[in-house]
Regions:
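Extracytoplasmic ligand-binding site segments that recognize negatively charged/polar headgroups
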Residues: 34-48, 69-73, 85-220
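A bilobed periplasmic-binding-protein/Venus flytrap-type ligand-binding module shared by bacterial periplasmic
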Residues: 137-144, 183, 254-269, 285
């Protein structure tokens, strides 16, 4: 009898352990969030070192941050993975490539949407929630000795041969932004500009991280980036060496957003993450990404004085962006 009781006790203990482990695993599952982001969001220059730890501390939710390449590559990764994707939230989807992601996302009417200016809320269905914005610009190395160009067409001149780094519109939101910029500024001449620059530029990088890395390594003194890019160098390197150029053509605007993936099993955690981006993380996001916060009440550091403000700004719809990328692929990327 004692042996039977002993065996039963062991069985009860074992089942209790299994049950406790199951509960623990479920609890852990509820407290985990997988976020896909473009590489620089996850890297040394990005948000991983500040925003993610702060979110984890504030909420108790563990974030699995996945560097998925450039923004378009991150979208494509989710699409290719289909129902098997681990992704709960995708960040870094800009307004000019938004139509590539809409069908992958669930709407979320965050209570903090009211802090965002209506002009920045490009998705009326709230599948993509803006968290920062800026304008594209060419950044140059003021110690390189070159004469800084003042327009898009100036870049096609022989004196800038092999001195400019561009980015591919098919794989990067920065490249897509440059494409829209040339279209809005040059009209029908945008194709000729790209044909000339394809030969004149040092390279057309696959993403911003690769392109800007080549620039800071001294491979070329000019790179496509943002008017706000000098902020990083002022804040973290204490240098004004790298400066954004204001062109007479005007500049293309961009808005970065995050969205919740359809079918996520961590909807509550995903909502908490989006809300955090719109509140506590706003200044850290702006500083880490060298962009402007969407919440206009945020007080900006003095380093933002080094970001020039364009007098003329363009915006382009996502469907037009897709159309032009197709044309670019057919005529330029042959």
């Amino acid at each position: 009898m004692k042996k039977v009781l002993s065996v039963c006790a062991v069985l009860v203990f074992a089942l209790s352990c299994i049950f406790a482990q199951s509960i623990s695993e479920k609890s852990e599952e509820r407290k985990t969030l997988t976020v896909y982001a473009y590489d620089t969001f996850c890297g040394d220059w990005g948000v991983a070192g500040s925003v993610i730890p702060a979110f984890e501390k504030a909420t108790g939710i563990k974030v699995n941050l996945v560097a998925a390449g450039a923004s378009v590559e991150a979208i494509n990764k989710v699409r290719l993975e289909g129902a098997n994707t681990r992704c709960d939230v995708i960040v870094g989807v800009s307004d000019d490539i938004a139509d590539k992601a809409y069908d992958l996302l669930e709407a979320y009417n965050s209570p903090y949407l009211e802090t965002i200016d209506q002009s920045l809320r490009f998705d009326k269905e709230n599948r993509l929630i803006p968290y920062d914005y800026g304008t594209f610009a060419f950044v140059y190395d003021s110690e390189s000795g070159i004469n800084p160009p003042q327009s898009l067409m100036a870049l096609t001149m022989e004196e800038y041969r092999d001195k400019v780094i561009l980015i591919d519109p098919r794989t990067s939101s920065v490249g897509a932004g440059l494409l829209m910029w040339t279209y809005n500024a040059l009209g029908d001449g945008w194709k000729d500009w790209w044909k000339t620059m394809s030969a004149n530029a040092l390279t057309i990088a696959s993403g911003w991280s690769a392109g800007y890395g080549l620039f800071t390594e001294g491979e070329a003194p000019i790179v496509i980036s943002y008017t706000t890019s000098p902020i990083y160098h002022v804040m973290y390197e204490n240098t004004t060496r790298y400066q954004a150029l204001l062109f007479t053509d005007g500049h293309e605007a961009t808005i970065e957003a995050a969205g919740i993936i359809k079918g996520t099993k961590h909807r509550s955690e995903a909502e908490s993450f989006i809300d955090f981006l719109l509140t506590d993380a706003q200044i850290d996001l702006a500083n880490a990404n060298s962009m402007y916060p969407v919440n206009s009440t945020i007080e900006l550091p003095e380093a933002y004085d080094y970001a020039p403000v364009p007098g003329k700004i363009f915006t382009t719809s996502a469907d037009k962006t897709s159309e032009l990328i197709n044309q670019w692929t057919e005529t330029i990327a042959k």
